UniProtKB/Swiss-Prot annotation:
Low complexity composition-biased segments: 1-11
Species assigned in the record: Oryza sativa subsp. japonica
Stated name of the protein: WUSCHEL-related homeobox 1
Annotated localization: Nucleus
Biased composition (Gly residues): 12-25
């Protein structure tokens, strides 16, 4: 009995001590299990203050005024207002960082795509280097011949024809060489002038006339006595041919006669024959030499 009574007294004394400690100058810290749940009106007012009024980091006085104004729409404390502004600024910074990262990534991807495209173009057969020469109208590549634009071929033909026309007009006096129908004349062909045909001397222009004087042929023609000189030359050529024929016949007959005659008689006959031949074939009169 005594032991049980003593335990009851200790329990009662301990309870009184806790009450006394609770009533003393040191308060008891009890954690609060409630959280701030903002209402729609409170969030609307805070966002207007942040975006419209430009309040980013309010001081203690502003926090107290904002908290007092927001208590009309629900329970709120000053620390709730302070943390809301801090959290909102952190979200804004994170959003800007993500946006900048997305833009940078997109730009880098576009740059990589452009670089890849340029690399492909640089490796293509058309940009690898100078191609082999080909005929007009065809391009020779790695896979075969590809026909080029026909307009370029027509322009090239027109230029060549215009150059040929200018050459013929300047040096040959020929006209009428044109290009394809509908082609515009080139300025080079339009500014050309037609020259008179020139006759170049093909034979010596100095000859000796009948009177022994030296005469020069006129450019583009010859004097009237040139025809007489030509006829005289033709006559002398005919006489020379006849003399050669007579010599051939003479030697043939003389050789046959020598075989039939004796030695001294043949020599005398040959001398008489030669003297008579030279006298008959000589163009000069007898006794003039």
């Amino acid at each position: 009995m005594d032991h049980m009574q003593q335990q009851q007294r200790q329990q009662v004394g301990g309870g009184g001590g806790e009450e006394v400690a609770g009533r003393g100058g040191v308060p008891v810290c009890r954690p609060s299990g409630t959280r701030w749940t903002p209402t729609t009106e409170q969030i609307k007012i805070l966002r207007e203050l942040y975006y419209s009024c430009g309040i980013r980091s309010p001081n203690s006085e502003q926090i107290q005024r904002i908290a007092a104004m927001l208590r009309q729409y629900g329970r709120i404390e000053g620390k709730n207002v302070f943390y809301w502004f801090q959290n909102h600024k952190a979200r804004e910074r994170q959003k800007k960082r993500l946006t900048t990262l997305d833009v940078t990534t997109t730009t880098a991807a576009a740059a990589d795509a452009d670089a890849s495209h340029l690399a492909v173009l640089s490796l293509s057969p058309t940009a690898a280097g100078a191609t082999a020469p080909s005929f007009p109208g065809f391009y020779v590549g790695n896979g075969g011949a590809v026909q080029t634009d026909q307009a370029n071929v027509v322009n090239w033909d027109c230029t060549a024809m215009a150059a040929e026309k200018t050459f013929l007009q300047d040096y040959m006096g020929v006209s009428g060489v044109g290009c394809a129908a509908g082609a515009a004349p080139t300025p080079w062909a339009m500014t050309t002038t037609t020259r008179e045909p020139e006759t170049l001397p093909l034979f010596p222009v100095v000859f000796v006339g009948g009177d022994g004087a030296h005469r020069h042929a006129v450019h583009g023609g010859f004097p009237s006595n040139f025809q007489r000189w030509g006829s005289a030359a033709a006559t002398s050529n005919t006489i020379t041919v006849q003399q050669h024929l007579q010599q051939h016949n003479f030697y043939s007959s003389s050789s046959s006669q020598l075989h039939s005659q004796d030695g001294p008689a043949a020599g005398t006959s040959l001398e008489l024959t030669l003297s008579s031949y030279y006298c008959s074939c000589s163009p000069y009169p007898a006794g003039s030499m």
